[in-house]
């Protein structure tokens, strides 16, 4: 039987645990690079889900004393100058076939600067052309809508930040080990997250099936989760979907709300600003949901996962409900995700190699 998105989501716990277990070996080039020069500024080149993964991880880099500049590859290649102050460059493409990311990487290399490629396929065009290919240790997903690979990309970025901070003594060994232990607990908790989310989706399936517009908000690291909902809901559920930074939503986008919209509010712990916005928007839309790591559910429209972790690691948990909703809402709407559409798109537009 061919794997589905659900197959890969259910594998995430084991896959993430394996990445954590092997990260010192798989990311050895990062540690070696960090031992040779001080790393204060990193340029990340990414688009699509890879860009969203970078948004999820960026503030942990900042916590580790590393400024992050995230660029869309095409815009970077065509219109921007490469920052000479960047100490390290990472190009991200799960397939390793993104034409724009490859072009952006070559622009950096033409200036005599090495590039790390974070990919599920080190033998891909991006992996082969890079100076340091980094395997995210998931293999290639045969389903076009990656889930396991997204979570693995976020985790690998967090581990890269951790290795640099460790190598350059910005974290003590005990601090670093506590972060690793948290990541291990997250991986072990994912099966329970899946069980709770499945029950939540079943409870609200009528609302989710009938949704004609989905909007998500998040803050900090959870902006990446909201943006990934935008990307993947658009691909799978195939109705207009958007993800916003919490405060940005309050500066105009709220004006489009109507009685057919479904809204999701992501939080790692009870957040007064997010909950005030949800309370205000509830009368104006079809339904509002809170997805939180808090212990107690606010109401039956709240999925409370009851997991206490550092804010910077919360995307690894809260992305799982998004991934499960992608699969189940598509199914509820009668969309067969195994049937490819626009099959000649990459060939005609040359967006993938």
Residue ranges and their predicted role:
Residues 6, 17, 55-58, 62, ...:
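Predominant activation on well-ordered alpha-helical scaffold segments within soluble catalytic domains
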Residues 33-185, 219, 254, 262-307:
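Glycine-rich phosphate-binding loops that contact phosphosugars or nucleotide phosphates
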């Amino acid at each position: 039987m061919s794997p589905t998105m659900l197959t890969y989501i259910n594998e995430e716990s084991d896959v993430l645990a394996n990445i954590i277990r092997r990260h010192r070996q798989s990311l050895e080039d990062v540690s070696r690079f960090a031992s040779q020069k001080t790393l204060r500024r990193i340029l990340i080149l990414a688009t699509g889900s890879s860009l969203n993964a970078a948004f999820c991880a960026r503030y942990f880099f900042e916590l580790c004393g590393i400024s992050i500049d995230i660029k869309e590859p095409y815009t970077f290649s065509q219109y921007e100058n490469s920052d000479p102050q960047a100490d390290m460059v990472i190009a991200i493409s799960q397939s390793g076939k993104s034409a724009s990311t490859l072009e952006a990487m070559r622009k950096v290399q033409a200036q005599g600067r090495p590039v790390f490629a974070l990919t599920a396929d080190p033998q891909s065009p991006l992996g082969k052309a890079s100076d340091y290919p980094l395997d995210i240790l998931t293999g290639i997903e045969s389903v076009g809508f990656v889930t396991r690979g997204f979570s693995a990309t976020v985790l690998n970025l967090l581990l890269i930040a951790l290795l640099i901070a460790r190598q350059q003594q910005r974290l003590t060994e005990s601090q670093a080990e506590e972060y690793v232990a948290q990541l291990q607990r997250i991986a072990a908790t994912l099966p329970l997250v899946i069980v709770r989310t499945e029950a939540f989706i079943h409870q609200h399936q009528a609302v989710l099936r009938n949704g004609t517009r989905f909007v998500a908000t998040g803050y900090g690291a959870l902006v990446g989760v909201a943006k990934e909902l935008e990307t993947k809901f658009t691909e799978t559920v195939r109705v207009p979907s958007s993800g916003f930074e919490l405060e940005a939503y309050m500066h105009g986008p709220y004006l489009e709300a109507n009685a057919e919209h479904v809204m999701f509010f992501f939080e790692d712990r009870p957040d007064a600003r997010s909950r005030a916005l949800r309370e205000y928007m509830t009368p104006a839309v079809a339904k509002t949901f809170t997805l939180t790591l808090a212990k107690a559910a606010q109401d039956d429209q709240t999925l409370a996962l009851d997991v206490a972790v550092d804010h910077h690691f919360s995307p690894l948990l809260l992305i799982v409900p998004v991934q499960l909703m992608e699969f189940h809402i598509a199914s509820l709407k009668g969309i067969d995700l195994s049937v490819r559409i626009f099959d000649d798109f990459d060939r005609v537009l040359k967006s993938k190699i």
